[in-house]
Amino acid sequence: MSTGTFVVSQPLNYRGGARVEPVDASGTEKAFEPATGRVIATFACSGEKEVNLAVENAKAAFKLWSKKSGLERCQVLLEAARIIKERKDEIATVETINNGKSIFEARLDVDTCWQCLEYYAGLAASMAGEHIQLPGGSFGYTRREPLGVCVGIGAWNYPFQIACWKSAPALACGNAMIFKPSPFTPVSALLLAEIYTKAGAPPGLFNVVQGGAATGQFLCHHREVAKISFTGSVPTGVKIMEMSAKGVKPITLELGGKSPLIIFSDCNMENAVKGALMANFLTQGQVCCNGTRVFVQKEIADKFINEVVKQTQKIKLGDPLLEDTRMGPLINAPHLERVLGFVKLAKEQGATVLCGGEVYVPEDPKLKHGYYMTPCILTNCRDDMTCVKEEIFGPVMSILTFGTEAEVLERANDTTFGLAAGVFTRDIQRAHRVAAELQAGTCYINNYNVSPVELPFGGYKKSGFGRENGRVTIEYYSQLKTVCVEMGDVESAF
C-alpha cells in the first residue's frame, strides 16, 4: 500500500462481531489522509438507537465473558496479541495513512499494543481476592468483580494504541467495552475489533461506534454504561466528568499537558539532546505528555541549543510511509493553522525562532496538499508567554534557561497541568530529589517518552486522574466485593 491509494470501502461501526452501518445517525464526518489532504472515508455518526444496540450487544457478551475463568480470558487476549504481532505491518500502515505519523513510529506503537495485551492476559489469570480470618473461626473474603459495560473514548494521536490500552485491562477484568474513536481517525479500531473476534471473544465484547460529541454524549448518559475512560482535551474531559457525575459513573481521564524537561549542567549532553527531541517531536509533537518546556541550566545553554537545533534540522520530513521519514504531517488543516498561530504569537511576544515553524511542502507532488510544517525551536522564552503556558500539540519546543535547582522546580511546577516531567543529570541524588518534587504523574530520569506497559501512566492536576497500564489499572476496571462469613451463632442486640 502506498500514500494516496487507500480508501475505506467497508462500514466503520462494529457490533455483534461484524462491521455494520449504524441504524441511525447524528450527522456525518469525513476522515482525511493527512499526508495528501485526501478524503479516505465519509461515515455516519452513530445516533442514540445505534448506541443502544451497541450497549445491548455488549451486555449480552458481558454475561458470557464475565463467567469465564481468568485463564480462559487470558487465552483469548494472548491469541489477540499474537494476531496483532502477525499483522503488525498492516496495522501500522493503516495507522500511518489515517494519522500521519511515520511508519517507523507506527510500528513501535503496534509493538506496545501486543505487549499490552500479553501483560493483561497474565494479570487476568492471576487476579484474586483476600481471605481475612475473623474471631471464633469466622472469616471474610474479597472478590474482585468486573464493572459491566465500559466505554473507551479515544484520541487521534495514538488511535490503535489507545484502543488497546483501554480494552486490554477492561477485558482482562471480565468487562465488555464500547470504543468510540476520534472522528479524525476512525479506521484502525475496526482492525482491533476484528482481531478480538477472531481470537475468540464473544460477539459484542468489543464494539466500535463512530461519531463526534453527540455520540459521546449518548454513551456517557446511557444508564447501562458502568465506566468511562477518556483520552483527550481538558475541556472535553470536564464535560465527560459532568455527564458521568449524573449517573455516578467512575471515570478515567488522561488529558492534556505542558510538561517540563529539566537539563542540568552535569548531564550527558548527547543523551539530553536526544531526550529533548524525543520529548517534543514524536508524532509531529502531537503527544499529550511531551516535555515542551525545556529548562536548560545557564552554564550549558548555548552548547545545548546549538546541538538541539543542528539535530532538529536533520529530521527527515516527507511521505510517512517511506522508511527513512521521521516526521509526517499534522492531523488536519485547522490544527496545522492553530500550531502555526502559536509560533506567530510567540514571535510577537518576543521569542526567537531558531529553526522551523513554517509550512513545509514536500517535493513529491501527491503530498502538496498535506498538512506539513517544519519542527520549530523557540528561544528567549519567558514563563508568561503563551507558548510556554498553553498546550500547542505540535512540533514546537520552547527553551528556557535557569540557574538553580530550587528555581527550576518552582517554575516547572507553575502550571495547571501535571501529566509528565523529565530530568537529565548525572547526579543520582539530585535526579531522585527532583523527581520527588515535580508535580507530575510520570517522571523520566535521563530519558523521555518511553511507555513500558508495566508502568502506570496518568496525570496530576488538570491532566486527569486514574491510570493506564501497570497492575494498578486493574483497580480502575473492577470493583471489590466483601463477603463476611459467620461460622457460629448470631449474637443479636435484640
Swiss-Prot record:
Signal peptide stretch? none
Name its cellular compartments. Cytoplasm, Cytosol; Cytoplasm
Its BP terms in the Gene Ontology are:
aldehyde metabolic process; carnitine biosynthetic process; carnitine metabolic process; protein homotetramerization
Which Pfam family, giving just one, matches this sequence? Aldedh
Provide the function of this protein: Converts gamma-trimethylaminobutyraldehyde into gamma-butyrobetaine with high efficiency (in vitro). Can catalyze the irreversible oxidation of a broad range of aldehydes to the corresponding acids in an NAD-dependent reaction, but with low efficiency. Catalyzes the oxidation of aldehydes arising from biogenic amines and polyamines.
Q: In which pathway does it act?
A: Amine and polyamine biosynthesis; carnitine biosynthesis
Catalytic activities: 4-(trimethylamino)butanal + NAD(+) + H2O = 4-(trimethylamino)butanoate + NADH + 2 H(+); an aldehyde + NAD(+) + H2O = a carboxylate + NADH + 2 H(+); 4-aminobutanal + NAD(+) + H2O = 4-aminobutanoate + NADH + 2 H(+); formaldehyde + NAD(+) + H2O = formate + NADH + 2 H(+)
So where does NAD(+) get bound?
A: K180, G232, S233, V234, P235, T236, E391
Q: Which residues carry this modification: N-acetylserine?
A: S2
Q: Which organism is it from?
A: Mus musculus (Mouse)
Return the protein name. Answer: 4-trimethylaminobutyraldehyde dehydrogenase
Answer whether the UniProt record assigns the keyword Isomerase to this protein.
Answer: no
The answer to keyword Cell inner membrane applying to this record is no
Q: How does it assemble?
A: Homotetramer.
The Gene Ontology terms for molecular function here are: 4-trimethylammoniobutyraldehyde dehydrogenase activity; acetaldehyde dehydrogenase (NAD+) activity; aldehyde dehydrogenase (NAD+) activity; aminobutyraldehyde dehydrogenase (NAD+) activity; formaldehyde dehydrogenase (NAD+) activity; oxidoreductase activity, acting on the aldehyde or oxo group of donors, NAD or NADP as acceptor
Which family, according to UniProt? Belongs to the aldehyde dehydrogenase family.
